């Protein structure tokens, strides 16, 4: 029996190394950008992608020891997967290093006109969400717990930043009251677009936050979704979109550069500082370019992660008995932990979710609005 167990262990393939899967992801993103610049008129995606990647990788390499010196080590929740306890103390708040890189590189694409002001507005909301995430991370670190701001406090700050952005966009007439769908279909929402926009800001940023639970997971998915958003904007060719497409590629580049240090085994985590900024930037671009539909499809992993938490909590509360115990749909939520506890190693869950995002991006491009 022992000999058989040894043979079985020898036949089990080792988990995919983080640097290999991260390298493949980077090749996919760069190939898409180069192909767009080669064959699509007015496409300029490769340059901001390359510049942001290089700067982000260097800044993160420089910044990780600084974060470690400040003792900004992640506190791992004890009720999570036990294998994650070994990650305790890994520097967090890495978003502080790379989000400004993406914002600055993306913001330098256009210097005048409406495009420049839109880039400024997107930069504002991205940095505002980074600050909210930073406050949350800092409170968590100073309290030595896995929780920072209260959920209500965090949502209020996010909503306030979103409302300021929407007032700015509304005064300039940048946001359409119709939601563009495939096949020349437009969903007329009129004034309802405004409460929907606030909801999407809150939902998307918290969904990207929930996705940031495994080494490289959120960074890789974010890089792919930003790339997909840029490609569909370039293909649609609407006025003003090329600048925002370039901004998306700068953000994709900053996350690829971050992934050099965040892939398994991670030397740094993005924290809420990075994940909230990621969701805020994606939502802002989607609203300004009437791309809520593509974002919904391409960000399907973010949606699935968020829904898994909602379903888990709802079912548990609905079935809770007198003993205080309820049923669970998933082994643990968010969704990536369900697969982990099912025996799939982290090094396979992450590239699996990346691959799913690639397919979702392709679907979003194929069924893009006109």
Swiss-Prot record:
Pathway given in the UniProt record: Cell wall biogenesis; peptidoglycan biosynthesis
Topological type in the membrane: Multi-pass membrane protein
Alphabetical keyword list: Cell cycle, Cell division, Cell inner membrane, Cell membrane, Cell shape, Cell wall biogenesis/degradation, Magnesium, Membrane, Metal-binding, Peptidoglycan synthesis, Transferase, Transmembrane, Transmembrane helix
Top-level lineage group: Bacteria
An annotated Gene Ontology molecular function: UDP-N-acetylmuramoyl-L-alanyl-D-glutamyl-meso-2,6-diaminopimelyl-D-alanyl-D-alanine:undecaprenyl-phosphate transferase activity
Cofactor(s) the protein requires to work: Mg(2+)
Record has Methyltransferase as a keyword: no
SS bond partners: none
Transmembrane segments: 15-35, 44-64, 93-113, 115-135, 155-175, 183-203, 213-233, 240-260, 268-288, 296-316, 347-367
Enzyme class: transferase
GO CC annotations, alphabetized: plasma membrane
PROSITE patterns in the record: MRAY_1, MRAY_2
Subcellular location: Cell inner membrane
UniProt GO BP: cell division; cell wall organization; peptidoglycan biosynthetic process; regulation of cell shape
Catalyzed reaction equations: UDP-N-acetyl-alpha-D-muramoyl-L-alanyl-gamma-D-glutamyl-meso-2,6-diaminopimeloyl-D-alanyl-D-alanine + di-trans,octa-cis-undecaprenyl phosphate = di-trans,octa-cis-undecaprenyl diphospho-N-acetyl-alpha-D-muramoyl-L-alanyl-D-glutamyl-meso-2,6-diaminopimeloyl-D-alanyl-D-alanine + UMP
InterPro entries according to UniProt: Glycosyl_transferase_4 (IPR000715), PNAcMuramoyl-5peptid_Trfase (IPR003524), PNAcMuramoyl-5peptid_Trfase_CS (IPR018480)
UniProt-listed Enzyme Commission number(s): 2.7.8.13
Key word Membrane present: yes
HAMAP family, A to Z: MraY
Family of the protein in this entry: Belongs to the glycosyltransferase 4 family. MraY subfamily.
Protein task: Catalyzes the initial step of the lipid cycle reactions in the biosynthesis of the cell wall peptidoglycan: transfers peptidoglycan precursor phospho-MurNAc-pentapeptide from UDP-MurNAc-pentapeptide onto the lipid carrier undecaprenyl phosphate, yielding undecaprenyl-pyrophosphoryl-MurNAc-pentapeptide, known as lipid I.
Protein name, entry field: Phospho-N-acetylmuramoyl-pentapeptide-transferase
Species assigned in the record: Synechococcus sp. (strain CC9311)
Gene this chain is encoded by: mraY
């Amino acid at each position: 029996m022992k000999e058989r167990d040894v043979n079985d262990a020898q036949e089990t393939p080792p988990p995919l190394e983080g640097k290999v899967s991260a390298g493949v992801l980077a090749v996919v993103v760069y190939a898409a950008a180069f192909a767009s610049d080669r064959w699509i008129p007015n496409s300029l995606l490769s340059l901001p992608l390359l510049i942001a990647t290089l700067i982000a990788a260097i800044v993160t390499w420089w910044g990780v020891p600084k974060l470690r010196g400040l003792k900004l080590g992640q506190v791992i929740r004890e009720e999570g997967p036990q294998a994650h306890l070994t990650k305790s103390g890994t520097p967090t708040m890495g978003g502080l290093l790379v989000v400004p890189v993406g914002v600055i590189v993306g913001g330098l694409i256009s210097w005048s006109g409406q495009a420049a002001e839109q880039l400024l507005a997107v930069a504002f909301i991205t940095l505002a969400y980074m600050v909210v995430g930073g406050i949350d991370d800092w409170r968590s670190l100073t309290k030595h717990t896995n929780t920072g701001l209260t959920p209500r406090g965090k949502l209020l700050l996010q909503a306030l930043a979103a409302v300021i952005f929407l007032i700015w966009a509304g005064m300039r007439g940048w946001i359409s009251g119709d939601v563009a769908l495939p096949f020349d279909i437009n969903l007329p929402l009129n004034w309802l677009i405004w409460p929907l926009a606030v909801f999407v800001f809150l939902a998307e940023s918290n969904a990207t936050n929930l996705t940031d639970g495994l080494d490289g997971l959120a960074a890789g998915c974010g890089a792919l979704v930003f790339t997909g958003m840029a490609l569909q904007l370039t293909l649609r060719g609407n006025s003003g979109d090329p600048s925002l497409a370039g901004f998306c590629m700068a953000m994709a580049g900053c996350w690829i550069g971050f992934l050099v240090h965040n892939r398994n085994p991670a030397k740094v985590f993005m924290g809420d500082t990075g994940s909230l900024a990621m969701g805020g930037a994606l939502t802002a671009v989607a609203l300004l370019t009437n791309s809520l539909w593509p974002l919904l499809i391409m960000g399907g992993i973010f949606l699935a992660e968020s829904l898994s938490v909602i379903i888990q909590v709802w079912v548990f509360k609905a079935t809770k008995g007198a003993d205080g115990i309820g049923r669970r749909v998933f082994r643990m939520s968010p969704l990536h932990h369900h697969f982990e506890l099912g025996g799939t190693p982290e090094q396979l869950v992450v590239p699996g979710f990346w691959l799913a995002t690639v397919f979702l991006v392709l679907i979003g491009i194929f069924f893009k609005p006109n």
